[in-house]
Amino acid sequence: MYVQLKIINFYKTHQKPNLRIVYFFFFFGLETFFSIINPNDLTFFNYVIGVNNLDLTKKPNSSVDELIYFFDYLDSCWSSLMKSSNQNSKPIPWGLLLSNLIRWYDSNTIEALINNIL
């Protein structure tokens, strides 16, 4: 519940509402496109990314953490939606991939990037 509230707050603090619409359709469109092309070969991405050990009870202390939570939440929602619609499809977990990429970069660099974009 806390994560969902933080996502809502993250959306409310956005200065550019058009940007989040673009992000939404871009990432969901990519995942849908690749899962339609060849859903059987996408298990490789799940193997490479590995298991995400994010503690959902931990409170995010920066906008970088909020972004990670946001992508993780998106990934879990979209994956469950795809699994319920087609049992054979294995969508690429773009949200999880992006959140792990964010973790690999320096927090201060991403913080500055977010502030410049927003």
UniProtKB/Swiss-Prot annotation:
GO cellular component: membrane
Membrane topology field: Single-pass membrane protein
Compartments, as annotated in UniProt: Membrane
Keywords: Membrane, Transmembrane, Transmembrane helix
Spans through the membrane: 21-38
Descriptive protein name: Putative uncharacterized protein DDB_G0287527
Species per Swiss-Prot/TrEMBL record: Dictyostelium discoideum (Social amoeba)
